[in-house]
Amino acid sequence: MKFVDEASILVVAGDGGNGCVSFRREKYIPKGGPDGGDGGDGGDVWMEADENLNTLIDYRFEKSFRAERGQNGASRDCTGKRGKDVTIKVPVGTRVIDQGTGETMGDMTKHGQRLLVAKGGWHGLGNTRFKSSVNRTPRQKTNGTPGDKRELLLELMLLADVGMLGMPNAGKSTFIRAVSAAKPKVADYPFTTLVPSLGVVRMDNEKSFVVADIPGLIEGAAEGAGLGIRFLKHLERCRVLLHLIDIDPIDGTDPVENARIIISELEKYSQDLAAKPRWLVFNKIDLLDKAEAEEKAKAIAEALGWEDKYYLISAASGLGVKDLCWDVMTFILENPVVQAEEAKQPEKVEFMWDDYHRQQLEEIAEEDDEDWDDDWDEDDEEGVEFIYKR
């Protein structure tokens, strides 16, 4: 199935049903009073994360989702039926962005997680609601309010522990094939990898981690060269980045300059991503003698000002791969996922009609208070007595 990691959709919640103006009319019951019912609320639009999905391709074809309108109120105080909700299923790892405001509405990071993206309109009030001591036959009602309407951008971001960085043909896909059951395409030409892929690395029966392979970066990727930097977003949730460097490029390019290009493009994309833990991994050491490979790797690390540990591996032959994977596993166990995103309270998404009914009922109560004569005195008794005499 084709991998699609971005899609734009339109979501429209249902309008609220209108209130009803009606009066009770039955035999032997004159002046029965108002009995108009309220309308029904409009249906909502929800997002739901589903671990069985892995692409947004469905939403390249189906782009509009509309919830059902609430039914109007009826006589005999009958309330209209609520509109049916609409649930849109997306892959785990999808970020939902309101294109109108640029606001991130939520990240769908767990299976079964639900997110309200468009709230249905409030129901209108029937004339029964407006009955008071001074208005026994109200003829006013309110209409239902329109449902929310939003244009959303869905961004699928892979959930992985380890992310792979490097120039095209650095050996990223060969590495992920060597350590997992994933089988990305491998060939001797640039941009063999066109879409991100995931692999699960199982160290033993209880320990494993997920590694993400993305298409290679080239100079000017931030300006759109090559495949651009659109796939770097898939590394934002990774805990550690493995920067693969071809120690002996077949095209004769300088490994130091290649590494600097990757670092530069990373910083242009996001300072947060550039600040993530990054490990230097020299690949294809089987093409050189051991001593020559070690000497060349040391020279490259010094030229980059690299003072931390670095690794020498051959993804094709498996040399040094197992030790690297165990060190990655140890790092992941010692640095569990920080629940900063969950602990941080997301900004409240404002819906159009959150306080609509409360405000309406408060206004009605204020009108009743104004009509009520609460400054009773002896001068008012004549009026009351006269009414009773008639």
Curated annotation (Swiss-Prot):
Residues 127-147 are annotated as: Disordered. One of its GO terms (biological process) is ribosome biogenesis. SUPFAM superfamilies: Obg GTP-binding protein N-terminal domain, P-loop containing nucleoside triphosphate hydrolases. One of its GO terms (molecular function) is magnesium ion binding. Residues 129-145 have a biased composition (Polar residues). Mg(2+) binds at S173, T193. Its EC number is 3.6.5.-. It is found in: Cytoplasm. GTP binds at residues 166-173, 191-195, 213-216, 283-286, 314-316. Its cofactor is Mg(2+). Residues 1-159 form the Obg domain. PROSITE patterns: G_OBG, GTP1_OBG, OBG. Residues 160-333 form the OBG-type G domain. Pfam families: GTP1_OBG (PF01018), MMR_HSR1 (PF01926). An essential GTPase which binds GTP, GDP and possibly (p)ppGpp with moderate affinity, with high nucleotide exchange rates and a fairly low GTP hydrolysis rate. Plays a role in control of the cell cycle, stress response, ribosome biogenesis and in those bacteria that undergo differentiation, in morphogenesis control. This is GTPase Obg.
